[in-house]
């Protein structure tokens, strides 16, 4: 019987099945043709499944039980900061005073919401060392694009229109090159040195009067802090460029160091990562962009301002890049992030970063000897393994990741960053206990032993999932995302 609930909801359909019977119409019936233009009307009925209520409930309940999230288990997805999200944040975001707002309400009726946005901006400025923030961008890559548009507007306002190049290290966050290209820049990639840091000589070689800026993730996607960051900032600024901070890895440095103090001019953050709001299917996200005062005039409109205790939206910003999305950003996510910041406080945020770094280094040391470490030095909040320490037939990182699923763990990020062969990128976050980290490490060690003793066990994993190993290349290149008869 359970087998049929492994089917698509459409495959459960049987003609004549009904979940509800509607009562007789008690108002005058009107043809749709009288109310809607012809081009908006279907020529045939929509092909919806015919199922009973119990079919629907069982189908979606069983689907939910097959799901995996941070509330179920350890989720060490590198470069994603899958930390536990305190439920008080959800309670705050569910308050009727927030949920019943409408973006078209007069400003006088939404003073509390505007104050929250204003105070959140101030908090983010304090955490990052920036002077102003826009809360509009919907997620990280949208924040990147917004920040790059600000950089472009800044150079064009100075009539320095030849600056068409953005430098991106090979260890940068994965979306950086794409965002730069979408913003209309030419992307110049520079290689990392053997320590996983930016090669200063390689940077000097590409800096010139055509460079608009350098995009940098610090710590990098190798989980390493860029120790020469002050010198890098000096070189970029002397060449007339701006320094852009991708906030993907801010969780490692809250309360310890600030991008603004390092010399960054523009930053974007991920409220859905660092500031504990659900993501990875539990969205939406939020990617605020912060700038130094020299760039504040270019921020998207509207900004939230305060005068004599009254909060208002300011559209009168002639140099602004304009609107980057409808309304004012993903407000629900802002509530959760602000709740998290207030709950943690300055010392709590600092402690969170310290524990994130401690957990990552603890795991790395436990796994050394069984797996190769890409750059074997003290890491920040995450680290990158480079496959098994001892080659076992043709067992690959993909096989290790699939085998982890059999043991109840979500696999880490694999094959990223691209500069590491057989990469396994692990970010434990600060919210996991030593017991969880030990269990995860013991499982990875057990898998390393299995790879030597029974490699086929890994090659055929996972063994215990409703769907076994998929052809992921085929799924990516030829996705079937729509059901048809």
Curated annotation (Swiss-Prot):
EC number: 1.4.4.2
Catalyzed reactions per annotation: N(6)-[(R)-lipoyl]-L-lysyl-[glycine-cleavage complex H protein] + glycine + H(+) = N(6)-[(R)-S(8)-aminomethyldihydrolipoyl]-L-lysyl-[glycine-cleavage complex H protein] + CO2
Cysteines engaged in disulfide bonds, as pairs: none
Metal-binding is among the record's keywords: no
Record keyword DNA damage present: no
UniProt-listed InterPro entries: GcvPB (IPR023012), GDC-P_C (IPR049316), GDC-P_N (IPR049315), GDC_P (IPR020581), PyrdxlP-dep_Trfase (IPR015424), PyrdxlP-dep_Trfase_major (IPR015421), PyrdxlP-dep_Trfase_small (IPR015422)
Keywords: Oxidoreductase, Pyridoxal phosphate
GO biological process, one term: glycine decarboxylation via glycine cleavage system
A GO cellular component annotation in the UniProt record: cytosol
SUPFAM superfamilies: PLP-dependent transferases
GO molecular function: glycine binding; glycine dehydrogenase (decarboxylating) activity; pyridoxal phosphate binding
Positions in coiled-coil regions: none
Gene3D superfamilies: 6.20.440.10, Aspartate Aminotransferase, domain 1, Type I PLP-dependent aspartate aminotransferase-like (Major domain)
Positions of modified residues (N6-(pyridoxal phosphate)lysine): 273
Needed cofactors: pyridoxal 5'-phosphate
Subunit structure: The glycine cleavage system is composed of four proteins: P, T, L and H. In this organism, the P 'protein' is a heterodimer of two subunits.
Family, as annotated: Belongs to the GcvP family. C-terminal subunit subfamily.
Database matches in HAMAP family: GcvPB
Function: The glycine cleavage system catalyzes the degradation of glycine. The P protein binds the alpha-amino group of glycine through its pyridoxal phosphate cofactor; CO(2) is released and the remaining methylamine moiety is then transferred to the lipoamide cofactor of the H protein.
Name listed for the protein in its UniProt record: Probable glycine dehydrogenase (decarboxylating) subunit 2
The encoding gene: gcvPB
């Amino acid at each position: 019987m359970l087998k049929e609930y492994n089917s698509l909801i459409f495959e459960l359909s049987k003609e004549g099945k009904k979940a509800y019977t509607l009562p007789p119409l008690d108002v005058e019936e009107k043809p749709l043709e009288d109310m809607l233009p012809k081009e908006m009307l279907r020529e045939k009925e929509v092909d919806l499944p015919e199922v009973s209520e119990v079919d629907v409930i069982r189908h979606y309940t069983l689907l939910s039980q097959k799901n995996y999230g941070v509330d179920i288990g350890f989720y060490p997805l590198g470069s994603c900061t899958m930390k536990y999200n305190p439920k008080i944040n959800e309670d705050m975001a569910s308050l009727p005073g927030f949920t019943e707002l409408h973006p078209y309400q007069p400003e006088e009726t939404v003073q509390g919401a505007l104050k929250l946005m204003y105070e959140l901006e101030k908090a983010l400025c304090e955490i990052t060392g920036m002077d102003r923030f826009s809360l509009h961008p919907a997620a990280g890559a949208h924040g990147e694009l917004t920040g790059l548009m600000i950089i472009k507007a800044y150079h064009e306002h100075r009539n320095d229109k030849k600056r068409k190049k953005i430098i991106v290290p090979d260890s940068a966050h994965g979306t950086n090159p794409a965002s730069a290209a979408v913003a209309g820049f030419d992307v110049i990639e520079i290689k990392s040195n053997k320590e996983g840091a930016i090669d200063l000589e390689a940077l000097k070689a590409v800096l010139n009067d055509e460079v608009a800026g350098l995009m940098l993730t610090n710590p990098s996607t190798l989980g390493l802090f860029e120790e020469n960051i002050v010198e890098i900032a000096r070189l970029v600024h002397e060449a007339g460029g701006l320094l852009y901070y991708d906030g993907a890895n801010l969780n490692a440095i809250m309360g310890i160091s600030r991008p603004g103090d390092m010399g960054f001019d523009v930053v974007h953050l991920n409220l859905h990562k660092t500031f504990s709001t659900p993501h990875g299917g539990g969205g939406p996200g939020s990617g605020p962009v912060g700038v130094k005062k020299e760039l504040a005039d270019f921020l998207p409109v509207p900004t939230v301002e305060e005068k004599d205790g009254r909060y208002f939206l300011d559209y009168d910003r002639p140099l602004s890049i304009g609107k980057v999305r409808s309304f004012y950003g993903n407000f629900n996510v802002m509530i959760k992030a602000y709740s998290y910041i207030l709950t943690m406080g300055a010392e709590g945020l600092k402690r969170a970063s310290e524990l994130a770094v401690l957990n990552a280094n603890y795991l790395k040391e436990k796994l050394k000897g069984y797996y190769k470490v890409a750059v074997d030095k003290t890491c920040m909040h995450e680290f990158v393994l480079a496959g098994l320490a001892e080659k076992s037939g043709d067992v690959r990182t993909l096989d290790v990741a699939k085998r982890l699923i059999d043991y109840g763990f979500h696999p880490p990020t694999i094959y990223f960053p691209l500069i590491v062969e057989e990469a396994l990128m692990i970010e434990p976050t600060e919210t996991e206990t030593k017991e969880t980290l030990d269990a995860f490490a013991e499982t990875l060690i057990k898998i390393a032993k299995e790879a030597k003793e029974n490699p086929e066990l890994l090659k055929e994993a996972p063994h215990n999932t409703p769907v076994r190993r998929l052809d992921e290349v085929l799924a990516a290149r030829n996705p079937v995302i729509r059901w048809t008869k």
